[in-house]
Curated annotation (Swiss-Prot):
Main function: Reversibly catalyzes the transfer of the carbamoyl group from carbamoyl phosphate (CP) to the N(epsilon) atom of ornithine (ORN) to produce L-citrulline.
Domain of life: Bacteria
Record keyword Transport present: no
Cell compartments where the protein resides: Cytoplasm
Gene Ontology CC: one annotated term: cytoplasm
Entry's EC annotation: 2.1.3.3
GN (gene name): arcB
PANTHER family: ORNITHINE CARBAMOYLTRANSFERASE, MITOCHONDRIAL (PTHR45753), ORNITHINE TRANSCARBAMYLASE, MITOCHONDRIAL (PTHR45753:SF3)
UniProt cross-references to InterPro entries, sorted A to Z: Asp/Orn_carbamoyltranf_P-bd (IPR006132), Asp/Orn_carbamoylTrfase (IPR006130), Asp/Orn_carbamoylTrfase_sf (IPR036901), Asp_carbamoyltransf_Asp/Orn-bd (IPR006131), Orn/put_carbamltrans (IPR002292), OTCase_ArgI (IPR024904)
Name under which the protein is recorded: Ornithine carbamoyltransferase
Species of provenance: Brucella abortus (strain 2308)
Family recorded in the similarity comment: Belongs to the aspartate/ornithine carbamoyltransferase superfamily. OTCase family.
Binding site for L-ornithine: 166, 226, 230-231
Pathway annotation from the record: Amino-acid degradation; L-arginine degradation via ADI pathway; carbamoyl phosphate from L-arginine: step 2/2
């Protein structure tokens, strides 16, 4: 999404045209191949990425930090306790100040509106590294991972099991952008927000919703799940017993296509949303997903910065 000043923000998959998302994905594949071949690329030497963490994360911090360093740049980490974002200083003022110091801002936060406000007032690119509503960087890594293992994602069917959370919201947006289908199995009361489903359907995604996990898994090309309780939402979580039928185990995987993959954004609560047998099994690509956060995010950074005359 480009604002009135031509700044490219990576807000959500719904805010970036399908052609540009595909270009980012192909760039990620190419950058990964060059890295594996030992090529060194440092187009952003001297550039700085500010990383705002109001919700901490191993994968997000390390993958963005390493990614920016591999591109030749540097990072600075700012935690919520250090910044008091929106408390001792308004989000708008913080955005304006940081824009004078750094070349891009990544934010991992709670309320989606906080990230949107930061992007509204920043004069450098803002990247959504996670909010309570969406997780677009993760899903770009997931699409990359699927295509590495199984080829084009177009026309395939993903089956989601468990809580209708931020990862699912970005998954259905990806379904519209990359032309695949999503079968959603959630217990009553844990459905995804309707605005994301409505947008995905209006933009061509095939979305099926059910409370029956076996129905959702039937013939699927990939089964995806996440923790039953998201970080920071433990006090509002429903009892785990309602999610037990949605555990991804060998019996549920057997309902999918024999070549189906298993995905999880990690960290996983083994024995809850997924069994050891599945997550450590031959259909699991969870650690490829984790690695591909690095490559996808490098391509996202490049997309955000290229049109600002900052390398390639």
């Amino acid at each position: 999404m480009a604002n009135d000043n031509g700044i490219k923000h990576f807000i959500d998959l719904s805010t970036v045209p399908a052609t540009e998302l595909r270009a980012i994905l192909e760039d990620a594949k190419a950058r990964k191949a060059r890295l594996k071949a030992g090529e060194v690329e440092r187009p952003y030497a001297g550039k700085v990425l500010a990383m705002i963490f109001e919700k901490l994360s191993t994968r997000t911090r390390v993958s963005f930090d390493v990614g920016m360093r591999q591109l030749g740049g540097e990072t600075i980490m700012l935690t919520g306790s250090e910044m008091q974002l929106g408390r001792s200083e308004t989000i708008a003022d913080t955005a304006k100040v940081l824009s004078r110091y750094v070349d891009a801002i990544m934010i991992r936060t709670t309320a989606h509106e906080r990230m949107l406000e930061l992007a509204e007032y920043a004069t450098v690119p803002v990247i959504n590294a996670l909010t309570d509503d969406t997780h677009p960087c993760q899903i770009m890594a997931d699409v990359l991972t699927y295509e590495e293992h199984r080829g084009p994602i177009k026309g395939k069917t993903f089956a989601w099991m468990g809580d209708g959370n931020n990862v699912l919201h970005s998954l259905v947006e990806a379904a519209a952008r990359f032309d695949f289908n999503v079968n959603i199995a959630t217990p009553k009361g844990s459905e995804p927000k309707s605005q994301y489903i409505d947008w995905a359907r209006a933009n061509g995604a095939g979305i099926m919703s059910t409370t029956d996990p076996e129905k959702a898994a039937s013939g699927a090309d990939c089964i995806v799940t996440d923790t039953w309780v998201s970080m920071g939402q433990e006090d509002h979580a429903r009892g785990h017993n309602v999610f037990i039928p949605y555990q991804v185990n060998a019996n549920l995987m057997a309902k999918a296509d024999p070549k189906a993959l298993f995905m999880h954004c990690l960290p996983a609560h083994r024995g809850e949303e997924v069994t050891d047998e599945v997550i450590d099994g031959p259909q699991s690509v969870v650690f490829d997903e984790a690695e591909n956060r690095l490559h996808a995010q490098k391509a996202i950074l490049a997309w955000c910065l290229q049109d600002r005359g900052l390398g390639a």
